[in-house]
Amino acid sequence: MTKYNWDERHIITFPEKKLALETKDLHVYYGQKEAINGIDMQFEKNKITALIGPSGCGKSTFLRSLNRMNDTIDVAKVTGQILYEGVDVNASNINVYEMRKHIGMVFQRPNPFAKSIYKNITFAHECNGVKDKQTLDEIVETSLKQAGLWEQVKDDLHKSAFTLSGGQQQRLCIARAIAVKPQILLMDEPAASLDPVATMQLEETMFELKEDYSIIIVTHNMQQAARASDYTAFFYLGDLIEYDETKKIFQDAALQSTSDYVSGRFG
């Protein structure tokens, strides 16, 4: 078994680029166990960043901390800063529900509401008092077009979301997330339950979405990370080990551990 120097780091920063998000000394604890060990990380605006690493390395925990999904776990504690447009969204005075309108989440398994396709998109707006049908119609059409689903469902908008295939349901969940106009989309293994065709369609949707959104995706699929992302970050045991342009990570990684992981020789 190869021995690696886990004190080595290679982490890119973006001093001259527009940032979508930045973490400073971010720690996540579950009870007494530290799951994320003080991560400093910057995300460039309108790019796709992939988070990779072995199961249990902390990448999903880190992702969920970025819009405070870990708040729902009683024993979880998050310290450090999560900076969005200069505001620390980890601060105690932040309205979490308002913040999530700016930093949306798409989960591993499609989770459409038990409503029509149309109502899945308009639900949040209607809850906030939007009633004008023309406005809602425009939101539905725009969101479904951006998610690459409009042409497939435009004649079936009032059918149950559960009539859609798995891949279509996942794109509906993306449409639902972007309907409230977030700046950032967090995706936790969004293709894990999809077949190869649906996965490719999802990746094509991501390429189109990055024109308007910054995307951070957790994936176990190295081919997907290589194909679909601009930057890749390698996590191990709660630490950010290497972070660079995806091409460099997969073709000329700075660290042996990263090179071995992406090439399947890790261990």
Curated annotation (Swiss-Prot):
GO terms for cellular component: plasma membrane. It is found in: Cell membrane. It catalyses: phosphate(out) + ATP + H2O = ADP + 2 phosphate(in) + H(+). ATP binds at residues 53-60. It comes from the Bacteria. Residues 21-262 form the ABC transporter domain. GO terms for molecular function: ATP binding; ATP hydrolysis activity; ATPase-coupled phosphate ion transmembrane transporter activity. Gene3D superfamilies: P-loop containing nucleotide triphosphate hydrolases. One of its GO terms (biological process) is phosphate ion transmembrane transport. The keyword ATP-binding applies. SMART domains: AAA. It is a peripheral membrane protein. Keywords: ATP-binding, Cell membrane, Membrane, Nucleotide-binding, Phosphate transport, Translocase, Transport. Its EC number is 7.3.2.1. It is an enzyme of class 7 (translocase). Part of the ABC transporter complex PstSACB involved in phosphate import. Responsible for energy coupling to the transport system. The complex is composed of two ATP-binding proteins (PstB), two transmembrane proteins (PstC and PstA) and a solute-binding protein (PstS). Belongs to the ABC transporter superfamily. Phosphate importer (TC 3.A.1.7) family. This is Phosphate import ATP-binding protein PstB 1. The gene is pstB1.
